[in-house]
Amino acid sequence: MTQITTQQIDTIKEIISKYKNLECVECAQAIQDYLISQKIPGKRIKLYTGSAIGRNSYIYDETVSKNAISLNGRHQGIEIIIDEVEMIFDNHHPDGITKAQWLINLLFYDKLYHGQQFQ
């Protein structure tokens, strides 16, 4: 298994700092391109609420802001295993967040009120 260095994590943080809210696809692509160039294993995680329109098209992350982080029901991040922990890096988490916590923090209407999960 390839280990990721502190310097490489700092580079990922720099990449992420270039992306704003609603730019998760572009951010994930930039991180993925960097990981490939460094031969660091990672996995692109694509979430979908099941609806690109209507109230389920809005995804929120309560740890980020009160504004929606997605308007089309989709959000993406990159999973990197660091010290045997699945960490997610996206345009809102430059320091990374555990995959479990990331999935808990991301909300949409039917998840909040009806227990639906991402597809």
Task: Specify the residue positions occupied by each region the protein language model found.
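A structural boundary/capping signal
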Residues: 1-119
